[in-house]
Amino acid sequence: IIQDADLEYNPKEYPILIKPILEHNADVVYGSRFQGGNPHRVVYFWHMIGNSFLTLLSNIFTDLNLTDMETGYKAFKTNVFKSIIIEENRFGFEPEITAKIAKMKPIIFEVGISYNGRLYSQGKKIGWKDGVRAIFCIFKYNLFRK
């Protein structure tokens, strides 16, 4: 399980996240802030627009139909995760791992999760430069890496 350390995602939802793997339906599961009926704190409009754009761009290159590529809540079968060499940190991680997973052609599920987004006054760190880095990583790991 990968979970951002800022607790915007609820650890009590691990059973929801890993259920498709435990039931032998999935190799990888993404928690989606944009699916399902779980509670979501309403925060920044432009973050949602940026996330939607990055997810769309990633989907174009990976041929996936994710709703939330940038989620910080993911689960993997051990063999899948161990086969990935991670190069990025910060906000380049999600586009990198999504591109590398897509090339492996595993069974991917998304599950609806809750989200308690933080404000900048509460320590939120992401900014426009992180979005630019994510775009760079989408191109880098989909076009120039095996």
Describe the predicted segments one by one.
Residues 11-91, 117-128, 132-135:
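Acceptor/aglycone-binding surface of glycosyltransferases and processive sugar-polymer synthases
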Residues 1-6:
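Short beta-strand-to-loop acidic/aromatic patch adjacent to the donor-nucleotide binding site
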Residues 94:
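Short-chain dehydrogenase/reductase
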Residues 9, 77-80, 105-107, 137, ...:
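Secondary-structure boundary/capping motif
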Residues 132-146:
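Basic/Trp-rich segment in TM-proximal cytosolic loops or flexible interdomain/linker regions
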Residues 64-65, 87-89, 98-116:
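Catalytic donor-sugar/metal-binding loop of nucleotide-sugar-dependent glycosyltransferases
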Residues 26, 86-89, 106, 140, ...:
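Generic structural signal for secondary-structure transition and capping sites
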